[in-house]
Amino acid sequence: MEETKAKILKVLTAIPQGVLYSTTDWHRILGADKRDIKHALDELESEGRIKVVKSEAGRSDKPLYRLKEAN
């Protein structure tokens, strides 16, 4: 799980601020199991390191994720 979280944060810090990714996008990028990715994303959100965005264009059951802006 820690390896997946590190990979997610590496990708998010390398892309422009505000770009959104879905769990399926993460599966394509990392090649990891979607359930492991979802657990890693949930942990990162609970740690306050990423933000979950409910997109108007996306499905309500498929949240999008982005790096949390520094305050």
Specify the residue positions occupied by each region the protein language model found.
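Short, cationic-aromatic polyanion-contact patches
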Residues: 1-5, 53-71
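A short, conserved structural fragment
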Residues: 45-55
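Positively charged, polyanion-binding regions of nucleic-acid-associated proteins
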Residues: 3-17
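Short amphipathic alpha-helical interaction segments
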Residues: 32-43
